Amino acid sequence: MNSRFNEIWWFYPSASGTECDSYVAFDYAENIWTTGTIDRTAGVDRGVFRQPFWIAADGILYEQEVGFDYGGQAPFAETGPIALGVGENVMAVRGMIPDENTLGDVNATFKTRFYPTDTERDYGPYSMANPTSLRFTGRQIRMRVTGNTSSDWRVGIMRLDAVAGGRR
């Protein structure tokens, strides 16, 4: 349980594991499910302590929701495919107006394709300068924002300058 974020967490061992190393979390306020991997076997919500405490299989006790440590991995968030209409039009992207809290600590990359089984084309990384010039086309576009591993960051609503470019 993580009452601060309206979440209930379930931990379980992956198919090859003998200890809990995977989770399913449910945000009951937003009705959102999340899955992932993290080595935790038990925990207690805030109340007795200021933050939740969870314990790993190796016996290390973690104070959750304090600071930021990405374990050497770059944190990211990625959209699903974005299309105009039902994908019948090509989208020409010309720019981006980012909403990012710590300018310079987050980059954006884009992947485009013209058909669902087509090879994706990569564009970027682009800094989150305000505004950012872009130039690429595709019927489906995915955006990934990747943060610096040594800083705390957040991203709000991103806006793209995109126009329909025909049905070719």
What are these regions (language model features)?
Residues 1-168:
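Beta-sheet repeat architectures centered on beta-propellers
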